[in-house]
Structures are given as structure tokens and as C-alpha cells.
Amino acid sequence: NGTMQNTSTALTKVEPSKSTETVELKNGDSYDLTASYVEKDINGVKYKMLAYNGSIPGPLIKVPQGAEVTINFKNGTDMNTLLHSHGVRMDNKFDGSQSSQEEMKPGETFSYKLKFPDAGMYWYHPHVREDYQQELGMYGNYLVVATDEKYWNKVNREIPLILDDVLIENGKINLSKKEADHTLMGRYGNVMLVNGETNYKLSATQGEVIRFYLTNAANARPFNF
């Protein structure tokens, strides 16, 4: 089963990562989202990583176009962090960047009131120490469903895929928690992840039409299809 690799702190109890869930919200709903450490198995070795609501990627949050929802975010890590909703048009005070609010200290909570005026796929991630927090698994998707049924061509299924790469050397994910290192400037990983898995599999039937939503959460790597 491998051993627990210490990438960050000496936390004694870390829960295993869970499968990513899909959460459907409607206008006016609230949802609780927590960032915390998890134990993640990669090719038989357990690593201490970071996650939203215990999964890598975090929950797929599905909302109708035009909806306004509240994300009650808790910082369950031992570092400062923020929740940035990438590409979503919103009030600046809920942008989740250092220019819009103070960094959230460990244990603090903040309610992000988000509006989703545009259909499509977006993603959320930290805007503090992305070289560390995002690299260890803090990312997830929003799927904004178009109000116009003809906005997209009809398909049999929709599948979001988050692509990532992790750099593992000598059995460890070596990241500097104390300060940002060269990782911030870009690096290639040597282990590919699709929806958090090294061996992601998908079954399809002949004639089935599938719409894929692709998010590149890798540090610097381009992906060719």
C-alpha cells in the first residue's frame, strides 16, 4: 500500500480522499465548501494532499444560468487561503483574490455570493500560494447550464475532465510550504491525472454523442488531443 509521504505538515490524522460528487444548486441556494488535507493514493503510494470537501478534484457545482448562490467557504488548512472563481463575472468583493479581500487565516470562514450570468464551464481554485495549494489538489469546476436549450447542440452525455500533472521525485511531492519556489514560475510534472486519477477510464457506446468539458489545472503543461 505504500507509505504516507509528508509533503506539508506533521498532521497525525488525515482522512482518505473521496470520489468527486456533483452538487446541483438552484437560485438562492447555499453550499458549504471546506479546504482541508486528505490522504491521496497515487500509484499505490499515499500522499498528503489538499482538497475541497475531501475530494480531488473538488465537487462539480452545477447551477442554472442566471442563478445567484452562496458558497460558505471554510479554511480547514493550516495556511492562509482564498477561494477564486475563475472566469465567473461577479461583484469584485467576492472575487477571492488578494486585491478584493484579506487572506483567510486557518479556521476562518467567508460567504461568497456568486452570480452566474454566462453558460459554460468554469473552475475554482485558491489565489494564495497556488504553487503549493493548487499543486496539491485544490481545484474544482462549476458547470453553468444554459437557459436556452438550443445554446448547445444536443448530446447523450456531458463529462467534465480536469487535467493535471504532479511532480513526484524519490517517492515524494517536494513543495516548499515556507515560501514560493521555482514551481511558481512553471514546471512539468511526471504523473498525469485525469479527474484526480492516474488510470481514468470511460466507457462509451457506438453512436453515443458526448460533450467533454476540459479544464487544464496543470502548472505549465499543454495537452494535445
Predicted segment positions?
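Histidine-centered copper-binding motifs that mark active-site loops
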Residues: 2-225
